[in-house]
Amino acid sequence: MTAATAAEMTGTLPPPYFSDRILACLKEPGGADDTGLVLEEGALRGTNSGRVYPFADGTIPALFLDQKGDGEGVTTAIKRFYEEYPFPSYEGLEDFGQLVQKGSKNPFSAQLLKAIGYNKTVLECGCGTGQLSHYLQLNNNHVLGIDMSLSSLGLAIQHKLRNGLGRSCFAQMNIFNLAIKDNSFDVVISHGVLHHTFDARRAFAQIVRKAKPGGIVMVGLYNYYARVPTYLRSKVIGLTGGKLDYVVRNRIHDARKADVWIKDQYYNPHETWHSIDEVLGWFEENGIEYLNTSPAILGTDGETTAGLFARTSPGTAFQRVVTQLGWLGTIAREGALFDVIGRKKEPS
């Protein structure tokens, strides 16, 4: 769906591909932070070089630089996988009202929107088909969702244009070479993505550069302990069918979306598992102050705090291990994703 088609369908002017606040955060692919981009008909143009970056398929802003050398094979395999299985996909022809209703009923997304607040710039690294990016543009937030899958981004932009959403913006980028200026976003999120890169630690170091000093960084990963049941199910799900999966049985009502979930969870060509302590090490390396973990670390004030971005104790190593073993009975049935939240330290 093009902007013109959307305008014909709705009888209104199409929303811009990028809001002014998001466009100001972009730079040329591989360029320095003093480069910028301007929006033209069906393309972006570099303000310094004059180079034109045409939209892929006429609708998707394409700022992707191929990965050469380290990790090229993994990047290519994952890109190919998500072109075939855009994730998480939509349940039929969802409108924005339905998406907001679902997001508001989901404890995680509702808490996240509340914690972000109002009038923020938000970067979602690995946005997939864009549901979270669309939801977070509520409260007058301006959101940029980036992904390398054109199939996923196509669905995200189709939803944007069909529903006239001007503050959720999308572009194809490589997470290891982002066409985004450093220190430009209030909140940087990567929820369930870095474990599909060839080096999650290096990918994390790239995305935190895009957060402003004092800004929020949130990373969601497969847990080293809680992912084990998914691995075991993967050995038999081809025989038993998708109903073995808790999410398919209880959450998904669309056959295509259920198939995409099964493929993502059990047939993904590359994934890595991680622990809270590993992420705490990444925080230390990249100047990130620890704030919170979701689900909360047992025996800490994280269990009682009202805000997802509130400063809490990381607990002891023993508490963190016990917490993650406990996740075998909770988040293990839903993909085993945990999130660690921090704040980028101000320069000393």
Can you name each region flagged by the protein language model?
Residues 216-248:
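Conserved class I S-adenosyl-L-methionine
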Residues 94-119:
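Conserved alpha-helix/loop element of class I SAM-dependent methyltransferases that forms part
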Residues 4-87:
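N-terminal auxiliary segments of SAM/dcSAM-dependent transferases
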Residues 201-213:
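A short glycine-rich, Lys/Arg-flanked "PGG" loop and its adjoining helix->strand segment in the class I
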Residues 129-140:
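Conserved SAM-binding loop of SAM-dependent methyltransferases across substrates and taxa
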Residues 256-345:
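Rossmann-like AdoMet/SAM-dependent catalytic core
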Residues 164-176:
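Conserved SAM-binding strand-loop segment of SAM-dependent methyltransferases
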Residues 176-187:
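A short acidic, Gly/Pro-enriched loop at the edge of an enzyme's catalytic core
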